[in-house]
Amino acid sequence: MKKFLAALGLVVGLACSASFAQISVSRHNFSSYGWSGGEICKPCHTPHFAHPENGALWNHAMSSASYTLFDGSTGSSTDFDTRSRLCLGCHDGTVALDSFGGTTGINFIGPAGNLGVDFTNDHPVGKTGVYPTSGTSS
């Protein structure tokens, strides 16, 4: 049993370090910005002030914007899934990057990462089929 627990701890540790390594070299590593408090995960994830209905111990403020989406031959739609809304909490330009942990921030995403709220000329985003679950196809 001790060997199993040690092996399990090693696997979990390696998985966590791999996730940390991926974000530490990405544009989502905000640890060098003063508003992040030097934290790499806290602007998005934390057990305190988390919004459990959004999953992943989500800590960042959610956008309340209305989106216009491409919906193929039927025109546009306003149906948008939660996972896409998590990303757009920063990337639609309506919520500050430093709006997390129950605070309201003042630092907004720059033009290169700001996707706005009009997706009528984009590929389908924000739909369940974009993120298929096991047993489904897209």
Give the ranges of each region predicted by the language model.
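Positively charged n-region of N-terminal signal peptides that target proteins for export
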Residues: 1-4
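C-type cytochrome heme-c attachment and multiheme electron-transfer modules
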Residues: 7, 11, 17-42, 46-138
